From Swiss-Prot:
This is Cytochrome b. Disulfide bonds: none annotated. Gene3D superfamilies: Cytochrome Bc1 Complex, Chain C (1.20.810.10). It comes from Laephotis capensis (Cape serotine bat). Binds 2 heme b groups non-covalently. Belongs to the cytochrome b family. It comes from the Eukaryota. One of its GO terms (molecular function) is metal ion binding. Keywords: Electron transport, Heme, Iron, Membrane, Metal-binding, Mitochondrion, Mitochondrion inner membrane, Respiratory chain, Transmembrane, Transmembrane helix, Transport, Ubiquinone. Changing A334T: In strain: Isolate MR-M981.
Length: 379
């Protein structure tokens, strides 16, 4: 008799995706982040669902409803901090996942890579709208500043901003629609994840060497499931440590003050995971130029497969490319730091230099390093 997991119409899809999936035997722990991201998404949807049961998306009650969740709802504080810090874990895993793709040349699977970039945009949009919901000072002013950037679009900009706001300023209509979209988008993200996996399973996984591994495959279960569970435990340990010991470590103290349109905080900044893009935005004096640089800082990932010049796929045997990769990593950390600093003398110039370097590394230095390594191979 045929095993039910291989014959049942539904179970066989799960079987071919997560159990009998042929996987390269050499993939390292850097390949764990896909499964961790799936778990992060599930955690965010679950905690978000329970939070939505108690939250009210009205400007007069939103802030108090969040306080009510923390004080009066059973384990409401834990739900709230799991959701807020779960978003941070989500972005840590996302950035490591993208970094792994860059380092090992996984971007050569163009459909999977492009789907991943779309997913990154969707997650960023969801996180931004979620940050507005507690209706604290930073929520309100963050929403005002970021949505206002669209007014830089020629001709239709102002109308577009007022259309998004649902009025002449960030108000009740804005909060209600942001809550609606924040609730809806994770389910769209879950559907996009299915497409991402569909494209991935068309080609099979890449591996650290970057060479085809068709002759050396092992089943996903039990080998990689065990490895993924280790990563899961480590992530849960980190998340629970954050939630139970320092839940506000990554938040902004200003968000504990109710939103006040008449009082601007001294330094408006987004959550830490957007600071690198925010620093790039601020480093350009022109509004439209800043908005374009902000969008391009993420959209540039789309053209990375076109900028691949090396004969080798992975960076594992390419020292020059490795140097440029770690320079990019350091540059992103510098941008993240700058994004959190006030706009004054040393920080402005550091931010501008780091922004130029960011685009320079991706567009010029990395392709040149690949070409140089090709020549070195001939020696």
């Amino acid at each position: 008799m045929t095993n039910i997991r291989k014959s049942h119409p539904l179970i066989k899809i799960v079987n071919s995706s997560f159990i009998d999936l042929p996987t390269p035997s050499s993939i390292s722990s850097w390949w764990n982040f896909g499964s961790l991201l799936g778990i992060c998404l599930a955690l965010q949807i679950l905690t978000g669902l329970f939070l939505a049961m108690h939250y009210t998306s009205d400007t007069s009650t939103a802030f108090n409803s969040v306080a009510h969740i923390c004080r009066d709802v059973n384990y409401g504080w834990m739900l709230r901090y799991l959701h807020a810090n779960g978003a941070s874990m989500f972005f840590i895993c996302l950035y490591l996942h993208v970094g792994r793709g860059l380092y090992y040349g996984s971007y050569m699977f163009k459909e999977t890579w492009n789907m991943g970039v779309i997913l990154l945009f969707a997650v960023m949009a969801t996180a931004f709208m979620g940050y507005v919901l507690p209706w604290g000072q930073m929520s309100f002013w963050g929403a005002t500043v970021i949505t206002n950037l669209l007014s830089a679009i020629p001709y239709i900009g102002t109308d577009l901003v007022e259309w998004i706001w649902g009025g002449f300023s960030v108000d009740k209509a804005t909060l209600t629609r942001f809550f609606a979209f924040h609730f809806l988008l994770p389910f769209i993200i879950a559907a996009l994840v299915m497409v991402h996996l569909l494209f991935l399973h068309e080609t099979g996984s890449n591996n650290p060497t970057g060479i085809p591994s068709d002759m050396d495959m092992i089943p996903f279960h039990p080998y990689h499931t065990i490895k993924d569970i280790l990563g899961l435990f480590m992530m849960i340990l980190a998340l629970l440590s954050l939630v139970l010991f320092t839940p506000d470590l990554l938040g902004d103290p200003d968000n504990y003050s109710p939103a006040n349109p008449l009082n601007t905080p001294p330094h408006i900044k987004p959550e830490w995971y957007f600071l690198f893009a925010y620093a790039i935005l601020r480093s350009i004096p022109n509004k439209l130029g800043g908005v374009l640089a902000l969008i391009l800082s993420i959209l540039i990932l789309i053209i990375i497969p076109l900028l691949h010049t090396s004969k080798q796929r992975s960076m594992i045997f390419r020292p020059l490319s490795q140097c440029s990769f770690w320079l990019l990593t350091a540059d992103l950390l510098a941008l993240t730091w700058i994004g959190g600093q006030p706009v004054e003398h040393p920080y402005i110039i550091i931010g501008q230099l780091a922004s130029i370097l960011y685009f320079l590394i991706i567009i010029v230095i990395m392709p040149l390093a690949g070409l140089m390594e090709n020549h070195l191979l001939k020696w």
